[in-house]
Structure formats: C-alpha cells, structure tokens
Amino acid sequence: MKTIKVTQIKSASHRLKNHKLCLQGLGLRRIGHTVEVQDTPSNRGMINKVYYMVSVEE
C-alpha cells in the first residue's frame, strides 16, 4: 500500500482536543517530527482535520 510522509509544522498546544487526538493517532509528537503512514481513508481524514498543523508529501 502507498505511504504518505506527514510532518508536524505547528504546535498542538491550545488546539481542539479532537485535533490533538488526530495528531496522536498519526503518531506525531512534536514540531518537526516526521512519520510515514499508510494512505488509508482514516489517515486521510485525520490529515484533513489538522491540515493547518502538518505538511504532507506523497
């Protein structure tokens, strides 16, 4: 399955609880942290929710 590189570029403090949980679900812990996740509809949904805090590379 295809993978996506996701990097956190903004802080999660003072954000909505659901958005913090999405970052946690993606495996992101801090600014500058990069993870590779599989390209699934659930991961895409989490990325779309926190689009303003992450950068995505195909």
From Swiss-Prot:
Sections of the chain in a coiled coil: none
Keyword hit for Ribosomal protein: yes
Keyword DNA damage: no
InterPro entries noted in UniProt: Ribo_uL30_ferredoxin-like_sf (IPR036919), Ribosomal_uL30_bac-type (IPR005996), Ribosomal_uL30_ferredoxin-like (IPR016082)
Molecular function GO terms recorded: structural constituent of ribosome
Cellular component GO terms, alphabetical: cytosolic large ribosomal subunit
Record keywords, A-Z: Ribonucleoprotein, Ribosomal protein
Gene Ontology BP term (one): translation
Family indicated by similarity: Belongs to the universal ribosomal protein uL30 family.
Oligomeric form and interacting partners: Part of the 50S ribosomal subunit.
Name by which UniProt lists this protein: Large ribosomal subunit protein uL30
Protein's organism: Acinetobacter baylyi (strain ATCC 33305 / BD413 / ADP1)
Gene that specifies this protein: rpmD
